[in-house]
């Protein structure tokens, strides 16, 4: 009975305003089909930010592989990975100033150095070392989230912290999986972590565009 009443009500409404409903429906359809248009400045920022964070995830991956296998290129990979943190810091200087960029690079360098300690401890079977490193990693993630959220209200601290924690979890899974020679789990963690890092890059780009719209009109 309720279903019948509902059908009758919908039918009555449709008969009463056929032309208005059709017009509204057509307009809604047009809006739904309207593509999102970015200015060139926005595209450039998103591409640059994605490149930087892709390097972050790729060179982190390369370091994990080299360090666990004891390859000769480990120190060189570490140098390149640390340089990426400086590049990310430099990328925000046009918006937040030199001091902020340098501070971000410092926090990210700490993030990488802690990761290196965790990899080393895991490789040697030092469970206490791994646990201690994970505590430091978590504290560093808190510092990063606090720093970034204080610079831009479009980067909520809770969202940043969640994104960073997920990044740490995927990276940890890579290390554990490689040590256990669970190659499928290792690759799955990397693939998901890679996609996640690009989402993080877009989150940062979107926040910058919202905070400084005048810089992205063309």
Each model region followed by its residue ranges:
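Bacterial N-terminal signal peptides that target proteins for export
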Residues: 1-8
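C-terminal segment of classical bacterial N-terminal signal peptides
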Residues: 14-22
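Cleaved targeting-peptide boundary
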Residues: 22-33
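C-terminal amphipathic alpha-helix
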Residues: 34, 41-46, 50-67, 81, ...
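Helix-loop segments that flank and shape redox-cofactor active sites
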Residues: 36-38, 63-74, 89-100
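Juxtamembrane helix-loop boundaries in multi-pass membrane proteins
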Residues: 76-80
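Mid-chain, structured segments of secreted extracytoplasmic proteins
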Residues: 82-119
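Short, cysteine-centered beta-strand-loop-beta hairpins and adjacent loop/turn segments enriched
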Residues: 121-123
């Amino acid at each position: 009975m309720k279903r019948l009443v509902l059908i009758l009500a919908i039918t009555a409404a449709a008969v009463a305003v056929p032309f208005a409903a059709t017009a509204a429906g057509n307009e809604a359809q047009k809006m739904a089909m309207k593509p999102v248009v970015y200015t060139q400045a926005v595209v450039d920022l998103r591409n640059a930010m994605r490149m930087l964070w892709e390097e972050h995830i790729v060179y982190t991956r390369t370091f994990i592989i080299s360090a666990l296998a004891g390859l000769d290129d480990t120190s060189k990979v570490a140098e390149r990975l640390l340089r990426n943190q400086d590049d990310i810091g430099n990328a925000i200087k046009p918006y937040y100033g030199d001091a902020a960029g340098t501070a971000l690079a410092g926090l990210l360098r700490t993030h990488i150095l802690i990761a290196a300690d965790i990899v080393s401890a895991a490789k040697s079977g030092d469970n206490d070392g791994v646990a201690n490193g994970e505590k430091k990693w978590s504290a560093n993630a808190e510092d990063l989230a606090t720093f970034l959220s204080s610079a831009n209200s479009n980067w909520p601290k809770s969202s940043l912290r969640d994104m960073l924690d997920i990044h740490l979890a995927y990276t940890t899974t890579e290390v554990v999986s490689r040590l256990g020679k669970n190659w499928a789990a290792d690759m799955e963690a990397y693939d998901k972590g890679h996609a996640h890092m690009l989402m993080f890059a877009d989150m940062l780009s979107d926040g910058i565009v919202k905070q400084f719209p005048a810089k992205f009109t063309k």
